[in-house]
Amino acid sequence: MKISANSIRTGNILVYNNDLWVVSKTPEHTQPGKGGAYVQVEMKNLKTGTKRNARFSSSDYLEKAELEQKDYQFLYFEGDDLVLMDTKHFDQINIPKEMLEEKLSFLTENMIVKVEFYNDKPLNIELLPTVILEISETDPVIKGATATASYKPAILENGIKVKVPQYLEIGEKIVVKTDDMTYVERAK
C-alpha cells in the first residue's frame, strides 16, 4: 500500500530499496525557505539492524509493508527471547528481546501486545499506547506545589525515569505513554 511521505509515523514499516525498514523516530517535517518541503526519516533495517536517515519530498509516495497483526499475550522471558501466546489459537512463539529495544521495560506479565507479521515472519511488537506504573522513587511533596506546573524526576517500578508533577508521592500509580515515556496523568 502506498502512503504519502507526510503520513509516515514512528513504527511504520516501509519497503525501501527492496528491504524492510522500520521508522525509529518521529519524522521531521521541514519547509525550507528555498526549495520544496521534505520529510527527514530515521529508519532501521529489519534484516541487518543498520540505521539510516532518508529524506523524502513531501509529494513522494512510499510503499508501506502489508502486515498481518495478531494479538499475543506475554508469558515470560526465556534467555534472550520473549515467549508470547496467540490469544485465539494458544500457539506459542519466541521473539528476540531486541525487537522491543528500550520499550522492553514496559512489558509486564500477561500483557496483551500486537505482533506484526510480514510473510508469516514476526517483524514488530506494538505495546499498548499507555501503561499504569507505580512511582518507586521521587523527591518529597512540597506544600503548595499544586499551584505551579513544575515537574520533578521520578523513578518508576520498572526503572524508567520520568518527570512528574510536584504533588505526586512514592507509591502512587501514574499513566505513562509507551512511545515517548512521558507522564500522562494520575491513575484512576
UniProtKB/Swiss-Prot annotation:
One of the GO biological process terms: peptide biosynthetic process
GO molecular function, one term: translation elongation factor activity
CDD domains: S1_EF-P_repeat_1 (cd04470)
Main location: cytoplasm
Pathway: Protein biosynthesis; polypeptide chain elongation
Keyword terms, alphabetized: Cytoplasm, Elongation factor, Protein biosynthesis
Pfam family, one: EFP
Superkingdom, natural source: Bacteria
GO CC, one annotated term: cytoplasm
Cross-referenced InterPro entries: Elong-fact-P_C, NA-bd_OB-fold, Rib_uL2_dom2, Transl_elong_fac_P/YeiP, Transl_elong_KOW-like, Transl_elong_P/YeiP_cen, Transl_elong_P/YeiP_CS, Transl_elongation_fac_P
Compartment list: Cytoplasm
Family (UniProt): Belongs to the elongation factor P family.
HAMAP family the record matches: EF_P
Protein task: Involved in peptide bond synthesis. Stimulates efficient translation and peptide-bond synthesis on native or reconstituted 70S ribosomes in vitro. Probably functions indirectly by altering the affinity of the ribosome for aminoacyl-tRNA, thus increasing their reactivity as acceptors for peptidyl transferase.
Identification of the protein by name: Elongation factor P
Gene coding for it: efp
